[in-house]
A protein has these predicted regions:
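ABC transporter nucleotide-binding domains
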Residues: 1-251, 320, 326-330
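Short catalytic/signature loops enriched in Gly
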Residues: 80, 243-330
């Protein structure tokens, strides 16, 4: 059973300024499934479509972003939810925080700088649960905080009184207060030092293990995916380049772009110079024809310049979009 099924999703930014129309193809024909009780990683360079993808699947679709094609369907137990056609009232009342929660890139995007942490918990809990007993609310909140290994005194602190790592942990605690089926974590370790990063990642892993929910982890840091993800999707220029179990992505990558990502990772004891990838990511308002990676690919063929490669299943749970794979020349 799938928790989330995304099929042929095309989400573009359509703008018009000074009489000039512009369409940015941020997500262009993306299809994938999420399953219960897994950590699914999404990786890729900046502006590859990662953030747009999670905006759509979380129901945060606002102009100039438009969904032109595709479907985003959830299964929460016996309940089916079509995310592209649900009303905003139903989304706010029944889905957000309770079934789908969002850990934003910056913890200060969630925490109000002039309100204590306990007030932010109160806003979320009171909105989604009919709690009239303040004592019961405090007990529930302290119990949740303690379960995640956080000291209860953070509840009476203002955000500026907490370290960056502690604020991020509080943001994760807020996102998991209702034990949602899906937690979307957007660059949860950005701007944190390595030691704090490890603590935040361990917290995410512990929450997933305790609640058996699904985590969609979005980050460009491949080391983070190696540490926590069960499966990884590699995006490039709005499309899926490769999707596979984490072990396969790191030990046997098939797409040339994935191969370069893995080869660029530092290895202890290796003093060799890492080769850089020539060129720059394409402009998604005017993407190249055919395979979008072909201007930078060392194995480019004529067909790559004209024909979009299909995302094909090459072995169990391993999909690749590359003409080289189809011709068995890698």
């Amino acid at each position: 059973m799938t928790l989330l099924s995304v099929q042929n999703l095309r989400a573009y930014y359509q703008t018009r300024a000074y009489g000039i129309s512009r369409t940015v193809r941020a997500v262009d024909g993306v299809s994938f499934d999420l399953f219960p009780n897994e950590i699914y990683g999404v990786a890729g360079e900046s502006s590859c479509g990662k953030t747009t993808l999670i905006k759509v699947i979380s129901g945060n679709i606002k102009p100039p972003l438009k969904v032109l094609e595709g479907s985003v369907n959830y299964t929460f137990g016996e309940r089916k939810v079509d995310m592209l056609h649900i009303s905003q009232d139903a989304l706010r009342r029944d889905i957000r925080w309770k079934e789908i929660s969002y850990v934003m890139q910056g913890s200060m995007s969630v925490l109000n700088p002039v309100r204590k942490v306990i007030k932010t918990f109160q806003d979320i809990v009171y909105t989604h649960e009919h709690i009239t007993n303040k004592k019961r609310f405090l007990e529930k909140t302290r119990e949740h905080i303690n379960r995640l290994g956080l000291p209860t005194d953070v509840l009476n602190a203002y955000p500026h009184q907490l370290s960056g790592g502690m604020r991020q942990r509080v943001a994760i605690a807020l996102a998991t207060v209702f034990q949602p089926a899906l937690i979307i974590a957007d660059e949860p370790t950005t701007a944190l030092d390595v030691v704090v990063q490890r603590g935040v990642l361990q917290m995410i892993k512990d929450i997933q293990a305790m609640s058996s929910n699904t985590v969609l982890l979005v980050t460009h840091d491949m080391a983070v995916h190696a540490n926590v993800a069960d499966r990884v999707m590699i995006m490039y220029a709005g499309r899926i380049a490769e999707e596979a179990p984490t072990e396969s992505i790191f030990n046997a990558p098939l797409h040339p772009y994935t191969q370069h990502l893995i080869s660029s990772l530092p290895v202890i004891g290796d003093r060799s110079t890492k080769a850089s990838l020539k060129g720059t990511p394409p402009n998604l308002a005017d993407p190249p024809s055919g395979c979008r990676f072909h201007p930078r690919c060392p194995y480019v063929m004529d067909v790559c310049r004209t024909v979009i490669p299909d995302l094909v299943l090459v072995k169990e749970r391993h999909r690749v979009a590359c003409h080289l794979i189809k011709e068995n020349s890698l």
